[in-house]
Amino acid sequence: MSKATKRKHVVKEVLGDYVQPTEHQSIVKVLGSPGNNLHEVETAEGERFLASMPTKFRKNIWIKRGDFLIVDPIVEGEKVKAEIAFILYKDHQRLLQKEGLWPEGFTQDKTGLVAKEKESSGIQSTEAQAKPQGEDSETDDDSGLFVNTNHVHYEDSEEESESEEDEEN
């Protein structure tokens, strides 16, 4: 099987299948990747350990911090205590939550994050209401714009622009 065909089948399997964890499997959250196809994960109870990525996923599927996985336990492992069985994307997570198979420890994290986001957006909305309506400070503020570091940045001062206007008149 060629690499492209293998990648196609692996991606189709990961994105298309809806898998429920068995009694031995558990759902974990990725905390980081120390390297060598190992990922530091945390269970809903707060236990941290390393999980290895099987060869079928390597260089085909990418896992980032904050993703959720279904892992198979490795009994004889001291540091590496699990092997990744399945990667859970948003659709998979919603389905498991609807079926009641989602761990309580992870649902509390999500509701906590949502509450924090609402609080921060509430603060921003009150700040927007506190500004006078006549000021157009949003148009003058360029701090939110992307800065291209590949181009030389020239500083324009008001004095130079005023003197250029005087010379033109």
UniProtKB/Swiss-Prot annotation:
Coiled coil: none
SMART domains in the record: eIF1a
CDD domains (alphabetical): S1_eIF1AD_like
An MF annotation (GO) of this entry: RNA binding
A Pfam family recorded for this sequence: eIF-1a
Cellular compartments annotated: Nucleus
Compositional bias segments (type: Acidic residues): 156-169
UniProt domain S1-like: residue ranges: 14-89
Function: May play a role into cellular response to oxidative stress. May decrease cell proliferation.
Protein family according to the UniProt entry: Belongs to the EIF1AD family.
The protein's name in its UniProt record: Probable RNA-binding protein EIF1AD
Source organism: Xenopus laevis (African clawed frog)
Gene behind this protein: eif1ad
